[in-house]
């Protein structure tokens, strides 16, 4: 690839060489963006969980939800796939914040359904719209019979969510900081970091702080792969 090409042209060349459908939105937080198909709608897979987390913090900021309230794993929350709550069994009780944290860091599907049930699907969508993500919708709770219709979003909306978290402007500075800390613990970050030199991310041998840290939320289903951070 020509090293004299602009970043946008280099990214476009990679995207256009791909046989499937791919779009990207990049924001350096200093006024420069790369936008290629940024307003195309895509199935969210588990990336919708980032919006659910934001909706939870918005409701908590208004006193309409409590991060410390206990919620219970009910039979209707069960769904297969990623997560740890399957090992605990129906009847397990945990704080809303703990369920939301599991929803992000290990993409726990049961925890996600618990949070959706706690907030309400319509409330979540109202919060998503209010936060300015006009092309993002949570269509259903997680159920593999409906997984292809879980939610839709755009690269622009998803990048905007993380840009606001990074700037401390999503809900509030305190809420953004808490969400950022949760996103930093996300286990499934290999898509974003795939081509990063490992020594940038892992400095355990030297004892030095990592040169790069990642706060993200990925999602995948069938032939769909999404990531953002």
Regions found by a protein language model. Name each.
Residues 21, 114-170:
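Mid-domain, small-residue-enriched loop/turn segments at the edges of structured enzyme/sensor domains
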Residues 194-229:
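Short, Gly/Ser/Thr-enriched beta-strand-loop segments that form substrate-interacting elements
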Residues 62-88:
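Short, glycine/proline-biased beta-turn/loop segments that scaffold the active-site neighborhood
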Residues 78-113, 151:
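Conserved catalytic neighborhood of penicillin-recognizing serine enzymes
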Residues 50, 149-184, 225-229:
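Active-site-proximal alpha-helical segments within enzyme catalytic domains
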Residues 1-43:
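Beta-lactamase-like hydrolase cores
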Residues 36-43, 89, 100, 147-148:
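A short glycine/serine-rich beta->alpha loop
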Residues 43-71:
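Active-site SXXK
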């Amino acid at each position: 690839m020509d090293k004299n090409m602009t970043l946008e042209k280099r990214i476009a060349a990679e995207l256009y060489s791909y046989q499937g459908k791919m779009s990207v939105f990049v924001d350096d937080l200093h006024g420069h963006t790369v936008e290629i198909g940024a307003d195309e709608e895509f199935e969210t897979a588990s990336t919708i969980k980032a919006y659910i987390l934001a909706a939870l913090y918005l409701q908590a900021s208004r006193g309409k939800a409590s991060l410390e309230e206990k919620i219970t794993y009910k039979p209707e929350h069960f769904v297969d796939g990623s997560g740890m709550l399957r090992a605990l069994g129906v009847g397990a009780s945990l704080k809303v914040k703990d369920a939301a944290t599991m929803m992000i860091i290990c993409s726990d599907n049961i925890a996600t359904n618990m949070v959706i049930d706690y907030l309400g699907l319509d409330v979540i969508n109202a919060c998503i719209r209010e936060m300015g993500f006009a092309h993002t919708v949570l269509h259903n709770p997680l159920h593999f019979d409906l997984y292809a219709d879980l939610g839709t979003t755009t690269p622009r909306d998803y990048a905007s969510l993380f840009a606001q978290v990074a700037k401390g402007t999503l809900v509030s500075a305190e809420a953004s900081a808490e969400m950022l800390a949760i996103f930093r613990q996300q286990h499934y970050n290999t898509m974003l970091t795939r081509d990063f030199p490992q020594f940038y991310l892992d400095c355990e041998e030297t004892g030095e702080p990592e040169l790069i840290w990642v706060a993200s939320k990925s999602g995948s289903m069938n032939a769909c792969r999404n990531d953002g951070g």
